[in-house]
């Protein structure tokens, strides 16, 4: 078959496919605008936004946040919710653990009056609610907290001590097969919070694993491993917060395995001012001499905590340092990308 005949045959095949499955069911990759720019939501920590390589967590994808207890998983997810709301988006929180603190969420910056929350009885209900919300095309981010708390209905109806092999893994695999395409069409970001477990009998290598089987690892575009590495001491005997280290364990949109560090303070969540200061020092924008921090010909202050407080008060200086950091790192800011969300009819999920 020569070139003109091949072209005619391809055009005929495309015409038949579009007639059979609808317009837009097949197209040139270059004409698909979604491949050229990724709409993202900021995480609240600039160091993590830079480590992700795209300026935040992507819309239309699945993101998994996992780590040990009290490592900041829910705090990070709530910051993403707050930033989505600040961009004019709608957020939903599926609280399978029944442990979300409205006061702390409000302190972080989430608008709890506009935040939709669901506390389902079983895992099937939780995942069905997530799919229905995504299918509506009106929700920008859905947080599922957590995978370990998604109890299959048959396990819930059974007795304590009954053995249920692979029930949760099968439930997650079935749900994610349906959810992935829906999220991509509606440009909804689904954030799954997950816990750490240990494999029994592992002598060599890392014994840690996450709950819910392998499906979530496969379908996630980004997997974020978050750990507490130290305490932030105050002037008195009590701690101000925790120092957190994050590793991007998987990334389909940028180079993986990058790391980032930031502070989580008990009275404000992720310290954006602390992130800016650390990055400014790292990129030689702010000079650190002993305990003093200098910017250009100006002394910012003595001691990291004092300078961090100064950056919180001085919005102009904060924005200037952030702009210079972004210019040096050449990573795009997380911006609002207008998406034409196609209205989809909501049907019950079987």
UniProtKB/Swiss-Prot annotation:
Where in or outside the cell it occurs: the entry states: Cytoplasm
Q: Which GO terms describe its molecular function?
A: ATP binding; ATP hydrolysis activity; ATP-dependent DNA damage sensor activity; damaged DNA binding; single-stranded DNA binding
Q: Name one Pfam family in it.
A: RecA
Which residues belong to the signal peptide in this entry? none
Q: Name one GO biological process term.
A: SOS response
GO CC annotations, alphabetized: cytosol
Instruction: Please give the function described in this protein's UniProt entry.
Output: Can catalyze the hydrolysis of ATP in the presence of single-stranded DNA, the ATP-dependent uptake of single-stranded DNA by duplex DNA, and the ATP-dependent hybridization of homologous single-stranded DNAs. It interacts with LexA causing its activation and leading to its autocatalytic cleavage.
The cross-references to PANTHER family, in alphabetical order and at most eight, read: MITOCHONDRIAL DNA REPAIR PROTEIN RECA HOMOLOG-RELATED (PTHR45900:SF1), RECA (PTHR45900)
Family membership, please give it. Answer: Belongs to the RecA family.
Protein name, UniProt field: Protein RecA
Query: Which organism is the protein's source?
Result: Chlamydia felis (strain Fe/C-56) (Chlamydophila felis)
Gene encoding the protein? recA
């Amino acid at each position: 078959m020569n070139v003109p005949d091949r072209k005619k045959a391809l055009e005929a095949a495309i015409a038949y496919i579009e007639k059979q499955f609808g317009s837009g069911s097949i197209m040139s990759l270059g004409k698909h605008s979604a491949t050229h720019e990724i709409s993202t939501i900021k995480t609240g920590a600039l160091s993590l936004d830079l480590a992700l390589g795209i300026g935040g967590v992507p819309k239309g994808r699945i993101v998994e946040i996992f780590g040990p207890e009290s490592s900041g998983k829910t705090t990070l997810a709530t910051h993403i919710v707050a930033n989505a709301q600040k961009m004019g988006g709608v957020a939903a929180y599926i609280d399978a653990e029944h442990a979300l603190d409205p006061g702390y969420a409000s302190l972080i910056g989430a608008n709890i009056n506009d935040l939709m929350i669901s506390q389902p009885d079983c895992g099937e209900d939780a995942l069905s609610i997530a799919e229905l919300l995504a299918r509506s095309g009106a929700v920008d981010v859905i947080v599922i907290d957590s995978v370990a708390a998604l109890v299959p209905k048959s396990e819930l109806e059974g007795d304590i001590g009954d053995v249920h092999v692979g029930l949760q893994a099968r439930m997650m695999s079935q749900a994610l097969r349906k959810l992935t395409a829906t999220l991509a069409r509606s440009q909804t970001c689904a954030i799954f919070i997950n816990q750490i477990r240990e494999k029994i009998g592992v002598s060599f290598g890392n014994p840690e694993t996450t709950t819910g089987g392998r499906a979530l690892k496969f379908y996630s575009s980004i997997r974020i491993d978050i750990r507490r590495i130290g305490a932030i001491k105050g002037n008195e005997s009590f701690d101000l917060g925790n120092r957190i280290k994050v590793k991007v364990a998987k990334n389909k949109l940028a180079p993986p395995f990058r790391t980032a560090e930031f502070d989580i303070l008990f009275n404000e969540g992720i310290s954006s001012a602390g992130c800016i200061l650390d990055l400014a020092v790292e990129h030689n924008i702010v000079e650190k001499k002993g305990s003093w921090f200098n910017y250009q010909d100006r002394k910012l202050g003595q001691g990291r905590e004092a300078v961090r407080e100064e950056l919180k008060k001085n919005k102009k200086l904060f924005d200037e340092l952030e702009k210079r950091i972004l210019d040096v790192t050449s990573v795009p800011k997380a911006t609002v990308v207008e998406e034409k969300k196609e209205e989809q009819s909501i049907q019950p999920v079987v």
